[in-house]
Amino acid sequence: MRNMKIITCLLTITSLVFTACGRGSNDIEKAKSVATTEHLKRYTEAISHDSCQGRKPFSEGAERAVNYIARQMKEVGLKPIDGDSYFQQVNIISSRTRCPDPMVLKTPKGKIPLDWLEGYTAFSARIEPEIDIDNAELVFAGYGIVAPEYGKNDFEGIENPRDKVAVVIVNDPGLGSDNTDYFNGDIMTYYGRWMYKFEEGARQGLKGVLIIHEDRGAGYPWSVVRASAQSKMYVDSDSDAYHCPLNGWIQFNAAKQLLADNGYDIDQLIEQSKSPDFKPISLK
């Protein structure tokens, strides 16, 4: 475990607003003078520069980035949050998940072996030495969404979720639609993001979530998923509270075979999953 200095853009903006409001007009005018389009452009260019190395935790680039942000805070007159410091300490753990190669899915028609990085990727953000998913039951849970404003709950009716791994579709039900009143149409909402699906799986108490990858729905090719799976993961020391034991992705064709072996057509299920009336389907 290591301590890491972090500062977020949200903190910068929030501090600017509340500090400015609580001080004199000169301070407000100073804040206005630096909060310009040109200043934000320079700021964005600076922290996205190659020298910051993607702001990867514990890297020299991340150190450059946070020190730059701290200087910017000082220049615009923001108050430090801890004595004379603009930094806070956060406990961060780096980990790497070793997965079975292949992972085998059991179906009514036999077994489907999925090669690591080619057929699937998986990781665990839990601070545990081993995650056991042997004999976990797979459930097709549509888009993996709980959205009361659209009358949609793709997990409704799942029993004993701690023993289940949900297989869900990337993106949201608005994909390919012109109806902006339903999940914002073809513009992805947060419900369509992979992070949301993993978060919702944890809220539902599931053992795991596997997202069906499809280039158009994800917005990027499988190579991005594969590259990410080979990198170290950085999580905070309380990550067990809001992560499933297992999260991952499977290739579209692998999911297609899995569903076909259970008597379902993947394209038909994708269409059915767009409806608020969709209910999860147990896979044997």
Where are these regions (language model features)?
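C-terminal motif of bacterial Sec signal peptides marking the signal peptidase cleavage site
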Residues: 17-20
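Bacterial lipoprotein signal-peptidase II cleavage site
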Residues: 22-27
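N-terminal capping segment at the start of a domain
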Residues: 29, 34-60, 76, 82, ...
